Amino acid sequence: MNKHERLDEIAKLVNKKGTIRTNEIVEGLNVSDMTVRRDLIELENKGILTKIHGGARSNSTFQYKEISHKEKHTRQIAEKRFIARKAASLIEDGDTLFFGPGTTVELLAEEVNHHTLTIITNCLPVYKILLEKQTAHFRVYLIGGEMRHITEAFVGEMANAMLEKLRFSKMFFSSNAVNKGAVMTSTLDEAYTQQLALSNSIEKYLLIDHTKVGKEDFTSFCQLNELTAVVMDYEDEEKVETIKTYIEVVD
């Protein structure tokens, strides 16, 4: 195994496991401790991992800095549009829906083309898209409160007080990360608001692209097995199969 193959193998191992011990790499690749330490330094300099005491941690596992709303609109757009179209097919005339924040949900809002719907959202960009479609039979409501500027979603006591009184036939939402059956986001405020909407929804659909699977974020707000189904792309079959061990994935 040459150096480039070894670096590639170490990167695959740390990304798969999240964190890895130096001695695991030494034994797995049959190389010296000093060689592994040099390789870890090189991979850290490339931004692939972060060295920790006795090993390394994948930089793709934990989302230390939440990505801006603008940047999210440049990532996995084809996959997100595919997910949005599949999610739209689950909506029926007469539904009362809750749309959570997120760029994938914004794309779902663009796809919605029904005659009779009531849609409630706490996300300003989602509301703006839906407002253009409003008619006497297609009603759109925005939940107010304290706005998180990075997601342009309303959270906090005012938003939660309104949500507590509402009931939804279906909820469509996204998340920053899904790992070991837990669905995660970046703040406690947003997590609690999502939990309230979930508890008041009959059917619950999580919209995620494959890059979110195996990552972690600050706090979890639900478990996959509490949901109706997950809507995702099929770019990584292994990740799809991972999700299927917890919950149905919409075909």
UniProtKB/Swiss-Prot annotation:
Q: Which GO terms describe its biological process?
A: lactose metabolic process
The entry's DNA-binding region feature spans: 20-39
InterPro entries, per the entry: Carb_Metab_HTH_regulators, DeoR-like_C, DeoR_HTH, NagB/RpiA_transferase-like, Tscrpt_reg_HTH_DeoR_CS, WH-like_DNA-bd_sf, WH_DNA-bd_sf
| The organism's place on the tree of life at top rank | Bacteria
Is Ribosomal protein there in the keyword field?
A: no
Q: Which GO terms describe its molecular function?
A: DNA binding; DNA-binding transcription factor activity
Q: Which UniProt keywords apply?
A: DNA-binding, Lactose metabolism, Repressor, Transcription, Transcription regulation
Please list the residue ranges annotated as the HTH deoR-type domain: 3-58
Matches recorded under Gene3D superfamilies: 3.40.50.1360, Winged helix-like DNA-binding domain superfamily/Winged helix DNA-binding domain
Please explain the role this protein plays, according to its UniProt record: Repressor of the lactose catabolism operon. Galactose-6-phosphate is the inducer.
Protein name, please? Lactose phosphotransferase system repressor
Species name for this entry?
Staphylococcus aureus (strain MRSA252)
Q: Which gene encodes it?
A: lacR
